[in-house]
């Protein structure tokens, strides 16, 4: 039987070799954390390489994602569908082993990591989802949801502000099945961290309410094992402080930043092999080492035991079992489509001139009755974002059966936690803040788009229309930023009907995040036929049309649709042929076929005006260089909203005059 150190050295060898072959990468962290990984993966982690989607598996997140050869080595050695050739293709085009772990490439990768601090935050979301799902479905004698979330993280993760947001909330909510390992190696890219990171990290986490196990030798298997056992037994989230040597095994580069982010070089790898007593050529693992790492039989046994538990649960609680399966499969209720469409039709038949943020709350109220999988929240703005509805019940440390999270003022943390909730499964997460403060959360939304996962954000107070709070709170460029993000759904509805359609599509869209952008001020409901209501889902549609071919097209979104309609009425009265296009979602419109887009925006009608209280430049792709844009080109001002709209040209008079200039 191989020693634990020898089994850990298999990780070190593969990590050295993979980085060397790619001629780029980070060997230091995998070599430093190999002993911890060996103990965790071989003695504690419940997983099944043959079924990486097993619902009750433990989750493992490598928050210090630059050390990706660590997780690739673990997956390969444990028996996942990740071959030695995949490891040889590390960092190569179209490989399953990209430079940072990416969700959806190699089986067993739970989340995309690399932007430091977001992995630990995703893990908080996963642990939160586990605790909530357990509270909703477990019964006495039937602990059907019962798993841990383990995280590796480095000094960089802890320096990032998002780690404070996430770990503070994790302590408050008592996420006892979250166990984090701090790779305390004292090194970052610039060198020894004491010059820029001298926090007392154990005391920091104690202040959060975590269970802290300090000063664990990260190269002592028995000490690591004892720490994990203690962590699992404690009802609080645990930080295991593991003192490690970066690049352990490299005789001349370990303990320095020289091994952090560059290949060791052939000479140093040979020296490391000799130092570690690893006598095998590059990418060669002996059969006995493979045999001791192989987790397939043990994993199949663990999953089979859980399947038997689930069968007993289903026999005792058939309704709950069916509902849990539906939610874990990401399926919507059977009556969803019919009921949701009826809700939208009823809204069109019963006009209400309300703020679209209120329309959003009404949509939550209507759809929420069908969706026990909703897991809502707001970054301390629930009364403003209007994200709570009659069925909302707040999560508390001692009662996790609810469906609403008070995230506090933590926009970035909230959004990345929601990514973890979505990745875990069983929930449709939505969060909220003012549109302006999506800036704090932007990278987590980008990660959701990159991972192709569901993350619904309610962004209210969407323009200068919020008024007196001024330019610090008035978004200008944010809508364009969201729209320009690949695989992001962005909706800015003009009334309660478009708002409900946007919500319906966001709930249905499992492979992308959605930004729902809503107004503070009241908006007039527009008249529509049933066909027009159907066309809302296409992102852009003809709301008002001219008799005969239009000579001018007004394109508007959100609060400016009402303005476009009024201007069109005046121009029509003066004999102009004007079409109004409501375009709540440019990305949805862009996905329509060419025939539909041509029908809405005929290419031979070049007199076009886009009207939106956001950055003007975005709209040239729709109006062309010969068109006009009534939008924002500066930041806003502090003043009542009506004065600001007038000052910045969002008036019927300005639209009419601009149209006449264009048609002259």
Swiss-Prot record:
Binds 1 Mg(2+) ion per subunit. Can also utilize other divalent metal cations, such as Ca(2+), Mn(2+) and Co(2+). Binds 1 thiamine pyrophosphate per subunit. Its cofactor is Mg(2+); Ca(2+); Mn(2+); Co(2+). It catalyses: D-sedoheptulose 7-phosphate + D-glyceraldehyde 3-phosphate = aldehydo-D-ribose 5-phosphate + D-xylulose 5-phosphate. The active site is at residue 411. Its EC number is 2.2.1.1. Substrate binds at residues 26, 260, 357, 384, 461, 469, 520. Keywords: Calcium, Magnesium, Metal-binding, Thiamine pyrophosphate, Transferase. Mg(2+) binds at residues 155, 185, 187. The keyword ATP-binding does not apply. Thiamine diphosphate binds at residues 66, 114-116, 156, 185, 260, 437. GO terms for cellular component: cytosol. The record marks 26, 260 as: Important for catalytic activity. GO terms for molecular function: metal ion binding; transketolase activity. Pfam families: Transket_pyr (PF02779), Transketolase_C_1 (PF22613), Transketolase_N (PF00456). It is an enzyme of class 2 (transferase). SMART domains: Transket_pyr. Catalyzes the transfer of a two-carbon ketol group from a ketose donor to an aldose acceptor, via a covalent intermediate with the cofactor thiamine pyrophosphate. Belongs to the transketolase family. This is Transketolase 1.
